């Protein structure tokens, strides 16, 4: 990349990508130009670090990764030791947890565009309620069918806020800052989210029992819903600001 790659288009003498692609999509955050004189660090500090909306949407990913890795990492051991599943039964529940994500991610973007007018967070909050209920069922049930179905629901629904938060991140910042915003979200999700879902869950489960680990996951559900709600308020605020600016223009 260092030999063949370059900077942004205008660093190479080309017009901005919005002009090249003739993108007609209306952005929430509109700038007069792409601030061609700003370095990557300046973009990060001015458009990412200071934007509370970017932090909220990044922590959506933190909490969803906490839930996903908490279930994914500890599902085999939990089902074998606590629920008394055989290895084949455990493998079935594990496979359903993973494969159930495919239809939900395919439909999530279409549903938000069609029925929620491009609003990403309402559907995310709805699916997170389902995730919380499914975790409780997965935690308390004992028969194979119920536990497997609950694991499938968690796997199906948890990927919806993960996917939609990635879309929302791009929409919350100017086009030239989308890469930095996505990078922050990815960094936090792995440093905090996956670490909490694996290591912290394990420590709590070992010291205080499996229930402590599941309380951590339910805390993550509540925290994620809160961040989705605050992100949604931020989107509505940006839309009002954009409408007001259009009237005065």
Protein language model regions, located:
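Cytoplasmic membrane-interface "Motif A"-like loop-to-helix N-cap segments
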Residues: 113-128
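C-terminal ends and interior cores of transmembrane alpha-helices
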Residues: 129-142
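C-terminal membrane-cytosol helix-exit motif in multi-pass small-molecule transporters
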Residues: 1-26, 227-232
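A late C-terminal transmembrane helix in Major Facilitator Superfamily
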Residues: 175-207
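Intracellular juxtamembrane helix-capping segments at the cytosolic ends
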Residues: 160-174
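Juxtamembrane intracellular "pre-TM" segments in multi-pass secondary transporters
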Residues: 12-56
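Extracytoplasmic gate region of multi-pass secondary transporters
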Residues: 51-106, 162, 166, 194-198
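A membrane-interface helix-boundary motif in multi-pass transporters
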Residues: 119-122, 202-221
């Amino acid at each position: 990349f260092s030999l063949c790659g370059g900077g942004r288009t205008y660093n190479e003498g080309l017009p901005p990508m919005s002009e090249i692609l003739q993108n007609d999509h209306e952005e929430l955050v509109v700038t007069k130009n792409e601030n061609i004189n700003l370095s990557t660090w300046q973009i990060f500090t001015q458009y990412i670090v200071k934007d509370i909306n970017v932090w909220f949407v990044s922590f959506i990913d933190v909490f969803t990764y906490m839930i996903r890795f908490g279930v994914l990492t500890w599902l085999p051991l939990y089902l074998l030791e606590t629920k008394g599943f055989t290895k084949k039964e455990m493998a079935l529940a594990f496979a359903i947890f993973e494969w159930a994500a495919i239809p939900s991610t395919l439909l999530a973007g279409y549903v938000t565009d069609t029925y929620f007018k491009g609003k990403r967070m309402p559907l995310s909050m709805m699916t997170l309620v389902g995730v919380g209920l499914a975790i409780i069922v997965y935690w308390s049930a004992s028969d194979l069918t119920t536990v497997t179905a609950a694991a499938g629901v968690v796997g199906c629904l948890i990927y919806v806020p993960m996917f939609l938060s990635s879309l929302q991140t791009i929409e919350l910042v100017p086009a030239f800052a989308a890469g930095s915003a996505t990078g922050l979200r990815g960094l936090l999700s792995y440093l905090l989210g996956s670490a909490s879902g694996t290591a912290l869950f394990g420590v709590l489960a070992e010291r205080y029992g499996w229930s402590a680990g599941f309380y951590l996951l339910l805390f993550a559900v509540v925290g994620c819903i809160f961040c989705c709600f605050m992100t949604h308020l931020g989107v509505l605020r940006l839309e009002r600001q954009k409408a007001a600016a259009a009237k005065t223009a």
